[in-house]
């Protein structure tokens, strides 16, 4: 025969012993606070304490002390109360900290409860938001008829769309009250505004901000007349509002108007008309030209997916496909694909006076080394390396018709290039157009300049 009350009574007795500091054989230090508890309760409640107390099971007569700095004292207080009472005090402020501490202490039940609490809180928030949206939709649906320029769902009454356009135009010209505010009928729905909560009103006010002018030049008696405005130019619907005789003051307060000069209103209409005309012309031009006939703003490489905005950049990019190196060094004859690479090579190698051998990386001079050529590339080798490899392996004579670059002190001056095919150009960044029948050479990516080795 099971007695369910025995478990709760046993927990209450243990909790009372803990609070009175009776038979407590484990001390927990957190942020200068000391928590006293029983080993058996900690061992049975937490996987971390189970592992910790199992290691110190030999010292049964002495109290065990543990220090934690990964969570706060308030968090451990809530967890310790849960161990002795089975009740977890969760709130939106401490649920994350408690779940983190429970994860550290290996308390799976507490982690599950925290996850359920977070999920239920999110569900409640979703329901509240859905309910708020439903209330807003109902209010706006019931209050679609309003006297104003904007549709905010606060208007009252049912209006008749039967006024001719001539009467409205005459009213707008003769009346000193510009009907840009709201005119409401409070006798139809006297308590509709009170049914909306304060949060709903704030949210609606945030999404529908209307200029709030305290009053207009109209008197309360003038507001008792018919307030007719043109609601939409597309449908031609006219709104008519009749206010009762017994609510002059409330009508005067609710029917807020924005005083705007008629000249400014006409100017706005003229500007809108001009904007429509310009937009129609632009759309007509687009329709005549079509999207395919518009000029392209990018240049695409015919050999890869690279795209550039300038034609000069495309021509420079094509050098990596054709294998051309149109910029040679004047001193050693080494060729480069970019002019800035030649200048950097000349400054770091030749102006520094430290040319190095391409193979052994030793410093060479004009006497101890020579320039050799391998295909379109030229580099310097010392006499020892040339003797090891063989003089016949590399031609060491430079053709006179090879293009040279003059690296003078004035680097801004653009040099003139002489190519084999007789084509001359003064722009080092732009080459002739490359047709689709270009032969692509396989180029080794070892054209970077050699940094001198300082011994």
Curated annotation (Swiss-Prot):
ZnF region ranges: C2H2-type: 299-321, 327-350
GO molecular function annotations of the record: DNA binding; zinc ion binding
Keywords (A to Z) from UniProt: DNA-binding, Metal-binding, Nucleus, Phosphoprotein, Repeat, Transcription, Transcription regulation, Zinc, Zinc-finger
Annotated protein name in UniProt: Zinc finger and BTB domain-containing protein 8A.2
Pfam families linked to this entry: BTB
Subcellular location, principal: nucleus
Function of the molecule: May be involved in transcriptional regulation.
Cellular-component GO terms for this entry: nucleus
């Amino acid at each position: 025969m099971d007695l369910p009350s025995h478990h709760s009574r046993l927990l209450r007795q243990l909790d009372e012993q803990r609070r009175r500091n009776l038979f407590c054989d484990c001390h927990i230090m957190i942020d200068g606070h000391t928590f006293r508890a029983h080993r058996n309760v900690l061992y049975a409640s937490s996987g971390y304490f189970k592992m910790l107390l199992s290691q110190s099971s030999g010292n049964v007569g002495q109290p065990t002390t543990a220090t934690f700095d990964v969570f706060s004292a308030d968090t451990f207080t809530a967890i310790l109360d849960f161990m002795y009472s089975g009740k977890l005090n969760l709130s939106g402020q401490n649920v994350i900290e408690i779940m983190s501490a429970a994860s550290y202490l290996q308390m799976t039940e507490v982690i599950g409860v925290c996850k359920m609490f977070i999920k239920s809180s999110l569900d409640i928030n979703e329901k509240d938001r859905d309910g708020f949206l439903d209330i807003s939709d109902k209010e706006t649906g019931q209050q679609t008829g309003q006297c104003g320029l904007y549709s905010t769902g606060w208007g009252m009454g049912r209006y008749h769309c039967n006024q001719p356009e001539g009467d409205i135009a005459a009213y707008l010209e003769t009346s000193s009250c510009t009907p840009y505010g709201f005119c409401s009928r409070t006798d139809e729905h006297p308590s509709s505004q009170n049914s909306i909560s304060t949060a709903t009103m704030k949210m609606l006010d945030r999404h529908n901000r209307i200029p709030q002018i305290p009053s207009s030049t109209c008197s309360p008696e003038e507001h008792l007349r018919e307030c007719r405005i043109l609601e939409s130019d597309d449908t031609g619907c006219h709104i008519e509002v009749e206010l009762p005789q017994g609510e002059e003051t409330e009508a005067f307060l609710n029917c807020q108007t924005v005083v705007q000069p008629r000249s400014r209103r006409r100017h706005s209409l003229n500007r809108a008309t001009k904007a429509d005309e310009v937009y129609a012309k632009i759309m007509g031009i687009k329709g005549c030209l079509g999207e395919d006939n518009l000029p392209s703003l990018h240049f695409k490489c015919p050999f890869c997916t690279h795209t550039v905005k300038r034609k000069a950049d495309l021509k420079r990019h094509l050098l990596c496909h054709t294998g051309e190196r149109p910029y040679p060094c004047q001193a050693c004859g080494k060729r480069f694909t970019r002019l800035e690479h030649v200048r950097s090579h000349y400054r770091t190698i030749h102006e520094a006076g430290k040319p190095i051998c391409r193979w052994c990386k030793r410093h060479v001079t004009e006497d101890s080394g020579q320039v050799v050529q391998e295909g379109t590339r030229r580099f310097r080798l010392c006499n020892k390396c040339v003797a090891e490899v063989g003089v016949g392996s590399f031609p060491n004579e430079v053709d006179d018709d090879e293009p040279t670059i003059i690296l003078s002190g004035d680097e801004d001056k653009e040099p003139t290039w002489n190519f084999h095919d007789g084509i001359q150009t003064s722009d080092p960044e732009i080459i002739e157009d490359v047709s689709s029948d270009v032969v692509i050479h396989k180029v080794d990516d070892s054209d970077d300049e050699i940094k001198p080795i300082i011994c």
